């Protein structure tokens, strides 16, 4: 009987031993912690899973689940029913294709953060996140979503990441309306085309909005944001928007519009503090550089004072909450839009502690030097810290310290401040504290935990004075700064006297004005505008007169006159360039930065630049041809075959026109374009091709003027030395050579400085600013167009003859036309004959009077036929014609007129004319 009792007991013991031995093996085979890394504090990290472990095998205290690089796995929709304490679920870098609706237990879920980044998600079940009432952060970045996730119920999401989903093309009004707590919306690299009216009407807490690299975005409706919008950050880099709404941006602090090709005008932004633009529209910063426009920052608060050594000092103004921190005293840096917080109100409680070890949002993140970028890295390695999420300083930032750069925030929250404790060793922090880089508007989370143990500052906060120093904390920078200038405004309310304190903060706008984009008018100085306007007007009139006179002349067109016509045309175009440029400068004075797109980047500047380069090159080529023509005429006067024929001259000038046209067209192709500076000249030497073009242009011009100088030096030497020329030709050519030398040296005076400074600038040795260059290029450059018509036309007798002849045709300057045409002697002779005939007629019989009149007519007809042999004499006689019958009736007036002619022609007539006049006047009646 005893044996029978012993055997079963032995078997039972053996069974229990075997069960004890195999149970760990069985459990290990099915336990999630064998496939994943489990932390006693409730953190589970899984990598490269083939299938998702059974939910029942996860620790019941799991608060953080991190699954990545696990291929195409399926996440059970009831995961939150089994893991009731789960707060942070990150499923990044997998191959998940869809998201089913999450089921929760008793309508409640503890999930705070959900991340699905870098998957291949295409569809999300309708209302998939509706039951996640505690969800504050949802990240669906870098997937293949084709539409915005649908929210059928009001959600508590504050941060929504949808970047990297180009299939999302519309913003659904219903879904956004169910996100009233939304503060940050990240829509970078999506396919959104328009921000419609009233789309953010329910999102009154929206602070940060990112659409950068959304190239499809072309329009923001004027009513996209409500008047009471809280939007502070708007990033539109690399989009296609052309304007911003004038309403709903009154609280905007940060605006980025880099690489937005067609954006040319900023609306009124009362509270703006930072603006980032591209170099081609950086002129918009001129509105802020003047110092007349500031950002405003006003808060209403009750006055409070503190007694300190018998002195009453106003307390520091209460600012708006820190950008990435809740509560906590804030320290205002001298840089605009910066905030630094140190824990929550006196640094109680720990801070960030999730989740350590990197990942999303693991351990915090470190931001690169590029703006608006974030990269995750592992948590800190200090013992003890990190505990408790969100804990005192906790989420979203256990306190932050702002760097000296504008709009940057760095956190030093997390365990380690008093009460911090608990958590995983080296916990890091999500979002924990953040350490901001030196680049504007960047954030780096450096892990929450970090400083050992508790202790630290007492609760309650520390009052700030006008200038204060942060108490020494290990591994934390010290900072001393002054708050912005305060402008108090009293306002009486039923609760007591309150007042507004406004900080007047200068706006930081990037890029700053540079040498090629100064914040000034087109011409820079007022006096330069006035003088250049007069220069342009005179050049226009003078060269137009020269061209009209030469083209309407009845003389044969020879080589010299042909070259003069070309030079007058070129100088007229250059005068037109100066006249238009100064006119535009006068119209846009004081407000040019609002006209840059219309003028400098428009067709007007390109056309004007083309005219400037074309006219200058054509003028230079024509001067070279005129110099060569005079050189052969003077130095090789005896060699008739060596001179330029009219046909050769025309061919050369056709080549000159082609050269000038090519040089003017090149900048229109993008090589050293005309839009670099406001005066529309090819200043751009940013690449090798542009530098080569500018250098070639200046070298050709320099070589041309050196050649002209050499030829004229030879001509002057021959004229002065006499050579083999006869006296008369020598005297005539001497005058011509000296006149042409003055012309060329005047051109040299204008061109030499331009060539010198231009070549140095083309090769990187800039000695003048753009403003100084305007004086050189716009004031001295067109002097040629004024000098040339006077030097080669108005100061020569030949041109005076042409001018007065042309004027006589329309009834002006008839007598001077007779003088320069050489017909004045014939005119005086005929007048004298008529005078004597009239005197004799007074004493003769009617028959003799008739004979005298017939004789006078016959003499006049003979004289008319004689003078009509040449066109010039015919022109002079016709313009000075008279009626013999009328003269006989007005003999006293004729006598007086002849007497007046004596005095007029006494000193100006040649000797043979004087002798002829004396004979006529002394002849008997």
Swiss-Prot record:
Chain ranges on the Extracellular side, renumbered to this chain: 28-529, 585-606, 674-691, 764-774
Protein's UniProt keywords contain Glycoprotein: yes
Region (5 X approximate tandem repeats) residue spans: 333-461
Keyword entries, A-Z: Cell membrane, G-protein coupled receptor, Glycoprotein, Leucine-rich repeat, Membrane, Receptor, Repeat, Signal, Transducer, Transmembrane, Transmembrane helix
GO cellular component, one term: plasma membrane
Glycosylation sites: 61, 152, 212, 435, 495
Membrane topology of this protein: Multi-pass membrane protein
Cytoplasmic side: 552-561, 629-651, 713-739, 796-925
Signal sequence residues: 1-27
Sequence repeats: 333-349, 350-384, 385-419, 420-453, 454-461
Biased composition (Polar residues): 301-318, 365-375, 400-410, 434-445, 476-493
GO biological-process terms attached to the record: adenylate cyclase-activating G protein-coupled receptor signaling pathway; hormone-mediated signaling pathway
GO MF term set: G protein-coupled peptide receptor activity; protein-hormone receptor activity
Ranges: LRR repeats: 85-106, 110-131, 134-155, 156-180, 181-202, 203-224, 230-250, 251-273
Cited InterPro entries: GPCR_Rhodpsn (IPR000276), GPCR_Rhodpsn_7TM (IPR017452), Gphrmn_rcpt_fam (IPR002131), Leu-rich_rpt (IPR001611), Leu-rich_rpt_typical-subtyp (IPR003591), LRR_5 (IPR026906), LRR_dom_sf (IPR032675)
Keyword Repeat in annotation: yes
Compositionally biased intervals (Gly residues): 341-362, 376-397, 411-432, 446-462
Family: Belongs to the G-protein coupled receptor 1 family. FSH/LSH/TSH subfamily.
Role noted for this protein: Probable receptor for a glycoprotein hormone.
PANTHER family: GLYCOPROTEIN HORMONE RECEPTOR, LP13728P
Identification of the protein by name: Probable glycoprotein hormone G-protein coupled receptor
Annotated source species: Anthopleura elegantissima (Green aggregating anemone)
Upper taxonomic lineage: Eukaryota, Metazoa, Cnidaria, Anthozoa, Hexacorallia
